[in-house]
Amino acid sequence: MSKRYARQLHSADGLIAAVEQYGFLPFFRNEIHGFSIEELCPPELWFADDVDGPWEWKGPAARSGKCLYGKLFNKKAGFVSREWIPDFANFRRDGYDFDARWDDGLASYKDKELYEAIAGEGRMLSKRLKETLNYRKGGNTGFETCITRLQMQSYVCIADFVYMQDRYGRPYGWGVAEYATPEELFGYDLITSAYQRDSQESKERMMQHLSSILPGASAQQLTKILKG
């Protein structure tokens, strides 16, 4: 358990505050005990019908401008605070802007199509993205694999969730993810502000931070979280 944040979460603001204090926070439980939104959230709020819980909070948190959200940890959802986004992106991108990664033969054509579509639009709903690039029956396959990889590499993130509405204007169902680049949400200058550091230096900075708030976690466990 963290030394700095042990309170349970009861609101989107509380979730954002936890992300800002931890710096990095997976959505689901993992090898590090207590280091997840799932464990910080009271069980009765996890899938409550009559009150908002973490599934509803993730949208406001993602669009708050205070944290990065997406499939960031072991191909599963999580948050990174605004303070740590530059080092996180520098480490995960390993010194490559997406164009440079493509030029060096380190990205697939499908990844390139998805990245360019999102970057070109600014923001793009997953439904429209699939339609635009023919990810439908009889068309392209592997959408989830590609979009998850782009998030893990920090080239793409989730900006918000858009919900269907009933005839009374009330949202319902699972929200449709709206994708964007981190540069679109936080600005190019912030995202690239750690580029002058070696990617391993960014990793060490993040390791030191997490070690200070998760003293019971091993270096191997922290490395696994940061590498994804």
Give the role of each language-model region.
Residues 1-228:
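Long, low-complexity intrinsically disordered regions
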